[in-house]
Amino acid sequence: MAPNIRKSHPLLKIINSSLIDLPSPSNISTWWNFGSLLGICLITQILTGLLLAMHYTADTSLAFSSVAHTCRNVQYGWLIRNLHANGASFFFICIYLHIGRGFYYGSYLYKETWNTGVILLLTLMATAFVGYVLPWGQMSFWGATVITNLFSAIPYIGQTLVEWAWGGFSVDNPTLTRFFALHFLLPFLIAGITLIHLTFLHESGSNNPLGIVSHCDKIPFHPYFSLKDILGFTLMFIPLLILAFFSPNFLGDPENFTPANPLVTPPHIKPEWYFLFAYAILRSIPNKLGGVLALAASVLILFLIPFLHKSKQRSMTFRPLSQVLFWFLVANLLILTWIGSQPVEHPFIIIGQMASFTYFLILLILFPTIGDLENKMLY
């Protein structure tokens, strides 16, 4: 019998074992679609970003007008730009749902996969931040100034670190140039870490909604989940295209239609919607260093999640108390997102402080406690 090239060719057999003949649990739900959706988001962002970079000029006097030129004069430049800007929002929607699914079903117990995933989230956040600075509008400039300035809270080396990052004594041309270089580089780093993420995942195999070992009931990835993933791509691209065609600026800030002016501060400096929860936590502490530490902790706390798992069951499928707590956490994050978009005044300050406190309380204390309690109730 002739050898199957799919299984014998050195390159094709890697693809085959990852995407075609991969043994997958038969009962994984649509919540397992988001990994592949993140992959397609990354590919879309790299392609649209590459096309935008061909028309972009990383110079403070030309950046804003080069983006305007792309939208007005380049063939379908407006569409490429709208897909890239809104594609970032969909990237974050997918990654937050992907993390939420991992949290709900106990996927974080695959520690290496989880940790590389958190590193991917941090890299994605860095990429989105430096990318937001590139159009050189008002919110781009002031966002860059405020967020990079946070590093000055680091004792002893802070101010030196900030000036080193800026390439001068304020956010200026060197800052924009290096941010463009970083924004071009980081997506390829994300692609590399994604391969490590998948390598670790394929070592253990996928988790499933029941959180039990599924070796006895595996099915091939293709055609079952490849088709399911294509359906997922379609269901994601439809709203993305609707947003890009009909209301491309819905998620943006109107302030960014004004070219950057170091002499005029916008009334409310705020990041894009996907950073608002962390921004609310940053603002809830009236001390600069404390706020920076809370901001870092709000994301880095994900590294601790595997160590805070106290339940004898992996998934939350049959743990009603943990489920209630999980949805409390989701509601809490939505409240933080809303607070981050509001001005710093009463009653938003106290609501933000309460929500920030609750966020850490749920993750660090209530989840392990409830896990222990459920063990006592069930066993």
Curated annotation (Swiss-Prot):
This is Cytochrome b. One of its GO terms (cellular component) is mitochondrial inner membrane. GO terms for biological process: mitochondrial electron transport, ubiquinol to cytochrome c. Keywords: Electron transport, Heme, Iron, Membrane, Metal-binding, Mitochondrion, Mitochondrion inner membrane, Respiratory chain, Transmembrane, Transmembrane helix, Transport, Ubiquinone. Heme 1 (or BL or b562) is low-potential and absorbs at about 562 nm, and heme 2 (or BH or b566) is high-potential and absorbs at about 566 nm. Its cofactor is heme b. Binds 2 heme b groups non-covalently. It comes from Casuarius bennetti. SUPFAM superfamilies: a domain/subunit of cytochrome bc1 complex (Ubiquinol-cytochrome c reductase), Transmembrane di-heme cytochromes.
